[in-house]
Amino acid sequence: VSERENLFSREIIMNQRDVSMSWEPDALHEECGVFGMYDFDGNDVASSIYYGLFALQHRGQESCGIAVSDTFGPRKVDMYKGMGLVNEVFDQEKIQSLKGNIGVGHVRYSTAGDSVISNAQPLVINYVKGTLMMAHNGNLINANELRDELAYTGAIFQTTIDSEVIAYLVARERIQSKTAEEAVVKAMKKLRGAYSLVVSSPRKLIGARDPYGFKPLCIGKRDNAYILASESCALDTIDAEFVRDVEPGEVVTIDANGIKSDKTLCMKPEEQARCIFEYIYFARPDSYFDGVSVYDSR
């Protein structure tokens, strides 16, 4: 992968040649991997995110990226993302250049839509409330409708992925909400589909799972740091302890005070639905989803 194909954050470069002007959602953009980490002691998290993404490589081989920020200093985002495998896009020098104790990472796989650098994640949105970093796994069935609604109110889209629709929706709701987690809950009320999200707003790491529980997301802990990951195998890679799964419909907020949960959108167990392909195809055999071993389920 050439350096020109990569995207180095401090100046986020959008190559308009890579951006489709027509909206073509990634209809089968479902097997991606997300990873987020917040180290309360101020240690850089890029290296741990790298290894977490490496463990999730089976979930996406087209592109990958890491975005980090420092909660103890100015809200400046360092990001690097590129086309290819995790170990192809990142080397030690690039990882060490990403300074920050909170961050999100993503590996992408799609069978429809554009496989270009502009569609690589994480996404970084700068808006009136600050900066939002987001990684998304899943697919929205009402992405066209939401995109049109946002576009008519002034949103300018730079990608062809439904993930950007979610990011703009969260940013818009944040302007009218007291907290970032409240904005995520409001945004989720408008989303239709299967998804898991990892969002970083100033000094908060937020994880969310669709109300049906179609896409997985779990919580881990290592020393004085918390982790959110698509699969438990990513926690094992960085010697983190598995805490629990994020419940379907739950929004988990991690900040200096620990973890808090919003279960406003949680559904009854009999109304929930899991993706069978996570157990028989997508996930690594050594992962666990909602207390079930992927290996045993196969």
Mark where each language-model region is.
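Conserved short alpha-helical segments that host acidic/polar catalytic motifs at enzyme active sites
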Residues: 4-248, 253-298
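Flexible, polar/acidic helix-loop-strand segments at domain edges
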Residues: 1
